[in-house]
């Protein structure tokens, strides 16, 4: 609950991010605060969000070394199959429209070719003095997200945005899943 978030920030070192759970487009809705230092800033951010005391929030370490933010989305497209969409992400994804799509399954080489098709590829390579992204880690993260389709037959769509490509590593910091109820299969005994 939101009332526990202030206490939770004490267990994390450095600055934190506070997000309201279950809200799409958290930035526009005023349901995310980043770079907060200490309990007083977390408390003030929660007050500004005007959440119910029992609202669920997530407190996590603030990642400040992102080379670029990416969109990684998988979506069921009947009758074709699963579509993987990659793009320059974060809050700019709709504005820039810099995306490319592939049909699953894919391998690492296909993911790299797709990333290179993005107009924002130079950002991944390291642009204007920024270090390059850890391409191996980024590709592994993308393939891991794509692999979720095999584990979740109820999944319709999974949008990970942003996935932060870092000089060392990559991390998904927000995701939105759409699932459907599946009929229960009964096996005779």
Regions found by a protein language model. Name each.
Residues 1-189:
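ATP-dependent carboxylate/acyl-activation modules
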């Amino acid at each position: 609950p939101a009332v526990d978030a202030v206490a939770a920030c004490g267990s994390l070192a450095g600055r934190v991010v506070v997000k309201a759970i279950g809200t799409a487009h958290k930035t526009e809705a005023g349901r995310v605060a980043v770079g907060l230092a200490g309990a007083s800033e977390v408390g003030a951010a929660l007050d500004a969000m005007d959440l119910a005391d029992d609202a669920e929030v997530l407190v996590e370490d603030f990642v400040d070394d992102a080379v670029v933010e990416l969109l990684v989305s998988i979506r069921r497209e009947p009758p074709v199959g699963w579509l993987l969409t990659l793009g320059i992400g974060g809050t700019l994804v709709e504005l820039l429209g810099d995306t490319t799509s592939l049909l699953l399954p894919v391998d690492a080489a296909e993911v790299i070719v797709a990333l290179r098709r993005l107009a924002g590829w130079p950002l991944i390579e390291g642009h204007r003095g920024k270090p390059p992204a850890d391409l191996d880690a980024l590709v592994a993260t993308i393939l891991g997200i794509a692999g979720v389709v095999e584990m979740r037959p109820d999944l319709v769509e999974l949008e990970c945005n942003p996935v932060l490509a870092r000089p060392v590593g990559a991390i998904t910091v927000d995701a939105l899943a759409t699932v459907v109820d599946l009929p229960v299969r009964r096996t005779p005994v």
